[in-house]
From Swiss-Prot:
Keywords tagged on the record: Antenna complex, Lyase, Phycobilisome
Function: An enzyme involved in the biosynthesis of bilin. Might be involved in the specific attachment of phycoerythrobilin (PEB) to the R-phycocyanin II beta chain.
Protein name as annotated: Bilin biosynthesis protein RpcE
InterPro entries: ARM-like, ARM-type_fold, PBS_lyase_HEAT
Gene Ontology MF, one: oxidoreductase activity
Amino acid sequence: MQNPSAENSQPPLTEEQVIENLRQTEDFSDQYYAAWWLGRMRSRHPESLPLLLAALAPLHDNPIHDERRAVALNAIRALGILQARSAEEDLRSLLKNNDYSVREESARSLGMIQAKAAVQDLCELLSGAPDELEQAQSGSAKLKEPYESVLEALGSIGVASSSVITIIKPFTKHSRPLIRASALRALLLLTGEQAWAPPLIELLQHDDPLIRRGALLDLGATGWMPALPAIKAATVENSLKLVALRGLAEKSDDTTVLDAMDALL
């Protein structure tokens, strides 16, 4: 399928046209784009949520149609962006889906919705013996569960119970740096304890630029103001620094963040 963000020579679609494209079931490319568009444009059309929820139904088919699966994944993402509380029950059920990507996107969207009822479901995905948490799936680099998105979701939801903190802590020692970063981000958000920040800042010095980028965005998401100098000095693209700084600005009235953003423009 064509990338939804790809430019083309066609005139822009209206919201009504997009709704009709998602409603019809013959052209999967139109459905795929429509599901993406409704999230991207923060649609408040009364039919947006019902149609996006209906697009999830094929995920329960066995076998699942590949193109319907792609539409459903875009619908999951859109429901998160739209913070659709009416989708919580459906998204929670999808955390038990056999498809890794479905679980990953559902966890991420539940975090965006801040679905407190999903905390126990998310914690169950983090359970397991230490060796299980490190073990990759057969023939794949993927681990047993999408730990990054689950950890980030728990941080975003904000339930700082002792049981949640306890289940997150082991992931700060995980062998994969981005999983460590997600755990540190979650703990910094949930506890406000500065002890979780230095290991996250250290990842800004990692040799792998992907890890530096991930750590930068995680720091920004925490809103932890003392991270400002490290974010400014990070060897990362200015466009990503702006995203991280915006995260700080959204949680602070300190004008030095805005000054740092202006300096990058």
